[in-house]
Amino acid sequence: MSDSETDLLKSVLDQTEATIAAVAATQEHLPTPCPEFDVARVVDHLVGWAKSFAVRLSGRPATGEPNDYRAGPVPAMEFHHAAEEIIGAYREGGEQSQKLPVGFVMMEFLVHGWDLAIATGRSTSFSPAAADLALDTGRAMLKPEYRGPGKSFGHEVEVPDAAGSVDRLVAFLGRDPAWKAPSV
């Protein structure tokens, strides 16, 4: 993959890390646009998957299910270390990085980073180019059988033709881009 794709991923990871770091203890039980997760579970999910992708990209054997991960007392630091490994692996261009599309990794962190930001009342500034790459990857990889109740992804939500790139991506993965937290 290109350096520009890796730079886009780094930007998404950096913004997601900052959002994780800004979560207050009083926000942990707030709902999110991802209906099965509250804020604390989105943080756990982000950290668990960052660690999982870092392990996978390094070629080390997997140790546990990322969806079962529970972050420690400083989740932003855990996320930061895993994100550094992820970026390092893509910059090195090893065999494992060729098997895991950068757009797929970007999709995971951009969408759940958006979930977390929206739920905690933070603004997002994810790059349209990052969202477009993630959306293109998602459209190529996500099969209909992966969508629906009890599945990894919700059904696509319709958005206007003029919707921005991030809104189109989150809608593709079953989120309502107009979702608002009940109270922040």
Protein language model features and the residues they cover:
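Extended, alpha-helix-rich binding/interface surfaces that flank or overlap catalytic cores
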Residues: 42
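Structured surface interface patches that mediate subunit assembly and partner/cofactor docking
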Residues: 2-18, 22-35, 48, 52-184
